[in-house]
Structures are given as structure tokens and as C-alpha cells.
């Protein structure tokens, strides 16, 4: 399918928006085509500017776990908007949503809302530094925690997709306080975190890496990370912007049984509206202004529309069997993808945790940044374009995840597997 209106809109956008997009990976540079411009979405489908329909496995990069335009969420937003879109003052809805988050997430005793995942991670790191009086942060190769200066070191997501080693504009004085070590390496944990001379304030980690593709934690990795950070007095931060309320109602920390000191959230907790949050132990969170000296603020923090959408979303997730059904559906689809790849004879590794997955075009198991980089990005680009022509919308990067929603039907998944087999056969025989 060709979207002529999308091509025209992209040309117009490039005149007034850098690269024609407001987030780099959307430009589709790594998959060799122009981006679709989306006009509307409903359930498991999105519709482009020409009105063409696509089965969506991106789901706004994760937030749409109940599918697009869920009527309960839309109604909550509409009902809230009648009373005004922003007050810059406290509201009852932010107290309600905060209470729901505290009840759900094991590590969170107090929570502060912000307007994006980047704000959440940036604020959590500042808080950890202020609380400990130390400066150095440790992250993991290929993990992405937003575009704050401290995180643009061996980062994932669009930084990895576009092959950018770092970013101009980030001073060396900032980067020198960030240490990046291999994900899933217990040896690196021991060597780095036990070194008292490094002055480490915190470790920030995606408990399931989701920005070099889906890379699950090796058995015992998160447990060892928790053990060492606790022994060394280092604040452990889980970046659950992707995994929060996605893997389970209590996030990855509930799923794996590992409780960090601080947690960053986003995506699902806003029901699809711009939102972020960071929270954790009360004694740490009490260091945030106005209770404490660590400053953080935001004009639109706790926006009433986002709070209303978030409350509606979390209520839906509380339905009996929601996660069991979603994860069973995801497992069946993943098994189908592996079966198709095996039947066609195309080398592929599929990593999945719950309803998050990535198909890597490589014969090598993907367990970290180094092995993720062995994936054939050119092959993925061809697969992406072939699937798009068939009306299937995948992430426009080998190093991003596919997300399942509760609205993906058996018929949807059967069709997706059929089109995948056609695409894989073309790739194999090319």
C-alpha cells in the first residue's frame, strides 16, 4: 500500500519540523521508507492519511495496552476536559491516581507525577544524587532512559537505530559521571559496583531492556544487582516506563520479585496521554521539594486530563484475568512466529517477556547490546516494508519492541502470521 497523502505531508513537515518528525525513529530512516502519517486509530488498527487500515503492533510504543481509543478512556478524558484542560494547581484526580500507583507498585510509597518518561528518569537520578551526596551514575549498554544528557552514553532506542555514538551538545563534564556496563553481566556488576572509589550514587536499569529490542534479564541478574546495590549503599532505580503496568499490574518488579529503591513510570499510566512519574521509598522521596532540598517542578505535572485517562486505564487493568489472557495470546503469537521462521528456514531469534517481544534477524541468541548489534538491520528493513505493504504496522527499527494489546483478535494474529510467512519466504528466496 502506498500513502500518497503521507508522502505529501512528510515533504511539508520537513520544511517546518527537523527531519519532518518530532521523534527521530519515526522518520523510518533505518527501514528505508517514508513514514506513515496517522489520522485515527481504533482497537488494534491505525488508519493513515489516505484512510488505509493497518494492524498495529507498535501501539504508540507501548501505552495502548487496551488498544486504541478505548471507550472508557475516551469518556474519562472528555468528562475531565469539560471542566478545563489545565489548572497548574493540585487536583483530586492526581491524589486518586497516586494512590492507585502506590497500591500497585511494590517499591513505591510516595510518587511524583511529571510529563514524560525522560523527566521521570532525569528527576530520579537527580534525587538519587541529592540523597546520597554522590555524583556517578551507572547504566547499561543499549539501555535507553530518555534524552537527558547523562543518559546519552551507549544508549538504545533512536540513538541506536540511527547509529549515533552519543550526541553533540552533551558536555564531557557530564558524561564523565556516567558509567555504562554490559547488560546481563554479573561480573561487570561485581567489578564496578564494589569499587568504592567510583563514588556511585545510583544504578538505573530497564529490568527488561526494551530499547535495543526486547532483551530479558538473565536468571539471577536483577537479584544480584539488588543484592550488591543494597550492600554498597547505592540507590537502585528501575526504569519501568515500558514495563510498568505492562508485564503485570505491579510491573517488572512484581513479575520478577525484585524491589528497587526508586521506580520510573510512563506510557500506560497516562492512558495514552503525555505523562511520567517517579516514586519509591518514602525516606528518599521526602528529599524532593518542597519537603526536601532536591528541586523538581513542572507546569503541566499532574495534568487533569492525563490523570483522568490514567485512572481509567488502571481500572481496566484490574479486570480479572487481563494479564493472563494478554500473556497467553502473546505467547501463542510468538510461538507462531518461531514456527514460521523455522518452516521457511530463516535465521531468527525471538525474545519475549509477557506482551513485549522482538524478532531479531540473527542466528545468535540476543542477550545484551553486543549480540543485539549482530542482527541484520537490512533484512529487517525489507521485512518492515513488505509487512507495511500488506497492511501490518511494525516498529520502524530492528531495535524496538512489538507490543500486544488486549484488542488483538485471533483473526488479527492469524492474518499477521500469514503475512509474516509470505514476507519471510521472500527474504529467504531473494
Swiss-Prot record:
**Which Gene Ontology terms cover its molecular function?**
glutamate-1-semialdehyde 2,1-aminomutase activity; pyridoxal phosphate binding; transaminase activity
According to the lineage, what is the superkingdom? Bacteria
Keywords annotated in UniProt: Cytoplasm, Isomerase, Porphyrin biosynthesis, Pyridoxal phosphate
One Gene Ontology term from the biological process aspect of the record: protoporphyrinogen IX biosynthetic process
Q: Which Pfam families match?
A: Aminotran_3 (PF00202)
- Please indicate if the UniProt record lists Cell wall biogenesis/degradation as a keyword: no
Relate the assembly described in the record. Answer: Homodimer.
The protein's annotated catalytic reaction(s) are:
(S)-4-amino-5-oxopentanoate = 5-aminolevulinate
Which cofactor is essential here?
A: pyridoxal 5'-phosphate
This one is known as Glutamate-1-semialdehyde 2,1-aminomutase
For this protein, the record's Gene3D superfamilies field holds:
Aspartate Aminotransferase, domain 1 (3.90.1150.10), Type I PLP-dependent aspartate aminotransferase-like (Major domain) (3.40.640.10)
Q: What is its EC number?
A: 5.4.3.8
Entry's family note: Belongs to the class-III pyridoxal-phosphate-dependent aminotransferase family. HemL subfamily.
Enzyme class name? isomerase
Pathway as given in its UniProt record? Porphyrin-containing compound metabolism; protoporphyrin-IX biosynthesis; 5-aminolevulinate from L-glutamyl-tRNA(Glu): step 2/2
- List the InterPro entries: 4pyrrol_synth_GluAld_NH2Trfase, Aminotrans_3, Aminotrans_3_PPA_site, PyrdxlP-dep_Trfase, PyrdxlP-dep_Trfase_major, PyrdxlP-dep_Trfase_small
This protein's record includes keyword Ubl conjugation: no
Q: Name one GO cellular component term.
A: cytoplasm
Compartments (UniProt record): Cytoplasm
Q: Which residues carry this modification: N6-(pyridoxal phosphate)lysine?
A: 267
